[in-house]
Amino acid sequence: MKLVYTDIRNPLTQYLTEQTATFAEQGKRVFYIAPNSLSFEMERKVLEYLPEQATFDIIVTRFGQLARYLMIDRKEAGQPLDDVGLAMIFFRVLSQFEDGDLKVYGRLQTDFGFINQLVALYKELQRANMSILDLEAMDSPDKQADLVKIFLAVTDILSKEGFEHQSKLAQLTGLVETGQLDEQLKNIVLVVDGFSRFSAEEEALVSALNERVSEILIGVYASKKAVQATYAEGNVYQANVDFLRQLSAQFQTKATYIGQEPVLDSIGKFSKNMEAYYDYSGTMIDLTPADQEKIQLWEVVNQKEEVEQVATAIRQHVHQGARYKDILLLLGDVDSYKLQIGKIFDKYDIPYYFGKAEEMSHHPLVHFVESLERLRRYRFRAEDLLNLLKSGLYASISQKELDLFESYILFADMKGQAAFSRAFSVNGRADYDAEVIKEKRLVYDLTVLEPLRAKIMEPLNQLFKAGPQSGTALLEKFMAFLEAIDLPKNMEKMSRNLSEVEQEKEEQVWKSFTHLLENFHQIFGKEKLKMDDFLAILQAGMQASHYRTVPATVDVVNVKSYDLIEPHTAKYVYAIGMGQSNFPKVAKNTSLLTEEEMEKVNLVSASSSRFDLVSRENIKKNHAAMMSLLNSATEQLVISTPQIYNEGEDSLSPYIKILQKMGLKSEERGRIKTLSPQDIGHYKSLLSRLIESERPSLETEEWEGQRAFWTVLVRHLKKKLESQSIEIPTITGDIASKQLSDETLAALYPEDKPLNLSASSLTNFYNNQYLYFVRNVLRLREQESIHPTAFQHGLFLHRIFERVVMDQSELDFDQKVDKAILRTRDEAEFAMFYNQDADARYTEEVLDKIARSSATILRDNDLVEIDGQEKSFRQDKALVFDLQNGKSVHVNGTIDRLDTLQINQAVGVVDYKSSDQSFSVGDFYNGLKPQLVTYLAALQELDETKDKPVFGAMYLHLQDPIIKLKDTKNLEQLEGAANTSLVYKGLFLKEESLGLNHFYQTRNQLYTEDEFAVLLNHNQELYKQAAMDILAGRFAINPYTKDGRSVAGEQLKAITGFEADRHMGMARRLVKEAKRQDWMERMKGGQD
């Protein structure tokens, strides 16, 4: 073995490649070994440094692949298993244990998080060159007993069923140690580059090869000063120096320096200063302004702005002639930056490549498998079924059918497999207006929905009815299910029009899926298994699968984690996210074994076996990564720190603080928006692409006489956008609606037809004009539900009261109420709402009590005679108000009940309410409560009431009064309190209301004939003003405010974007007056 090192400013890989070429010329077979994370980059570098830039005699590979090359002619020791297959073996073993077999891990037996940790421990033991029996020294007997029991059972299955139970490296080491490869090895040379330590498994292999191969050459970066130092703890080169010293002692060889002493350039000065800082020698080298230009420190507001700044700089480099492949982007945290880089680099048209395996978790096939498993585990939740259908891989269902199906199951609140397996029968109404209720117009066409339900459910029912059986039988049923839903065809259809790169990803996803099914067949083929476990295994396997793509071209910006960097990697290097959170990185132990347990095991293990303790390596690894980063760029290095990282403030890295002590200044980027050369380079490159795409159209433009190139370009683009009806919106803090076009208004409101309004639509208009537009023009509705709402509750009570009032039989009052309740319950539409589940039945019981309590006011009030229920004024009976423009307004509505006073035959209106309501002249004036006055206006026009006097219009709150016993002293007071809760509230005409009893709350609500006329006149004005705005197509976004500080009206935030704190100026302020007389004067004078 030969150990070499060189200064970090020297090209170590070039030196080793030259030595490698010499070995190849001597007829040796050379393996150039690199770490897993650097093997592809190292191969590129080695080929670049070779004079002919190609060779068959040198193979750049990894330790793991070396075993394949040297054992290629050997019979496989067993069938190989990947991590997913190994996880299946662990699941199979754990599912066979009985309760109580495992003392520590008994509750985690089939938890896939625990299983993945077991797989990780299995591989840790292989890297540590240990077996599970070596864990005896960890002093946790119950934990060790559980692990031994699990791992021995796993090893037994692997051996009996012909799977590999040793890693490739362990197999190779065994063959080397037994001399079976001696003839093959004597002409082999190993060159090792990029390592700062070996695992115990790698070290055992190197030790076995050392006496048998022609040569082993290991090279690292270190300074002479560090290698010759007696104390290396904390030194920036400690990792590499410890590595050299350990190998030197083990293999009795001395490390030698190769190459010349490098010229002290700018980065060399930074490196020397950093080394001096950490070895406390204090010999700092002064830096010139030219030196300081080689490394830039950026401070940027947030992560998004960091990526924006890097993208702009890359465009500038490319504009100046650089290639994308000359630029390297390093990330402090890959996961938190990945999404931003994808969006922003695509926007800037920068090709890039993540050199990291990508999870498949976002792919529709993974969503399909996840939804199928959740559908089974959670017993057919609607959301899981919808997610399954929305994957796009389940049968051939159009978007329109899917929308219809989703709408129906949300309406019907479908839950459970039984509900989905039955034919759809319940239905709902499209609207809740009285006319539509009378027509019983239904929403859903069940003749369309039922075949769709059957198409969806038949394959699922067939799959899920499978009981516990062999893995092979379950797999056959699953394959039949996939064929029934056309999964292969849907996958092919989904990938048909994708790019070549995306199609390659689709292919890898499909290979992972089929490989997973093959593994399942091999491992569980003869095992008895439940469908739940089969789907759980399938889901875990797909979630753990990754794919790696190769860029379509080598001219891309490479993106990777900064701790995988090597010196002299690219011309321009940008390292972002380098705050204290990531720079340095603090690795944490995630193993099932604690570091204390690992250390105890290490103390009693042989020298060839050991666990790597990550916390012990943190300082050494971070110093090495920092030095590699400083020396990574050959032209320029930029290190960027976000002030806000992952929504929290991030401090400066200690390494950056040291660079600042050396004289480097941090530059704030992204805040000052000035025109710079970088901006010009960026815009020119983008505009040149735009001009190229528009060149045919631009050739027809008149160029002569134009003052500037930009004038023509902007004019052309505006014309192009206008021709395609594309508008670039101006971003402001205001929101506004557009006036409807004449064509739209003509279709909505024909000249020969009146405008139809009602009290509820008028309330919508004065609540927020845009609310009227949404509800009464667009007719948008919230998702309907089979669960009864306040409307159904009110309708239910209305029907009961109607039947009680109209019942002319000889039954006593309570019997009439009982009869009315029973008949109303039996109506099909109410039975649908109130018999579906326990909640609905309880609601019906509550309504039953309310009906019985509220009915007492009919029984005990003998002042009035009820004339009838639901008097409508519609069509030819509607109220008619003529407008100045020649059109008319027809006001439609339905009165719940008409009463006649026995003493004077005056009529009154009763409106049933499910909440407490009263008449407020202020609310009426502002258009918020026109209902009672509108009904009074209707009484003057209806044939049966126009010649009769009117005593008032009132609300009746239908309720079951709750009285606090502490507020009453005896039963008489209790009854009185109950009676005062059931009263009529509204407005009453003073002259006609004489003699009203305690059931009518007339205090402060008596109006004279003159005041009544004022109310009627103002009511008409409210309708006319609203009609004029509606017919003009103007619908302002103006929810009302009572106090000018908060908004009480409907804001419709999701549709309008209205925010009370930003748009309060757009809210309609209600008029305020203190006294009724002031309101009357205002209405008389027509004041706003």
UniProtKB/Swiss-Prot annotation:
Family per similarity comment: Belongs to the helicase family. AddB/RexB type 2 subfamily.
Co-factor(s): Mg(2+)
Signal peptide per UniProt: none
GO biological process terms held by the UniProt record: double-strand break repair via homologous recombination
Gene: rexB
UniProt cross-references to InterPro entries, sorted A to Z: ADDB_N (IPR049035), DNA_helicase_suRexB (IPR014141), P-loop_NTPase (IPR027417), PDDEXK_AddAB-type (IPR038726), Restrct_endonuc-II-like (IPR011335)
EC number: 3.1.-.-
Identification of the protein by name: ATP-dependent helicase/deoxyribonuclease subunit B
Keyword annotations from UniProtKB, A to Z: ATP-binding, DNA damage, DNA repair, DNA-binding, Exonuclease, Helicase, Hydrolase, Nuclease, Nucleotide-binding
Summary of the function given for this chain in its UniProt record: The heterodimer acts as both an ATP-dependent DNA helicase and an ATP-dependent, dual-direction single-stranded exonuclease. Recognizes the chi site generating a DNA molecule suitable for the initiation of homologous recombination. This subunit has 5' -> 3' nuclease activity but not helicase activity.
Domain of life: Bacteria
HAMAP family documented for this protein: AddB_type2 (MF_01453)
Molecular-function GO term, any one: ATP binding
Assembly and interaction partners: Heterodimer of AddA and RexB.
Miscellaneous comment as given in the Swiss-Prot or TrEMBL entry: Despite having helicase-like domains, this subunit does not have helicase activity.
UniProt organism field: Streptococcus suis (strain 05ZYH33)
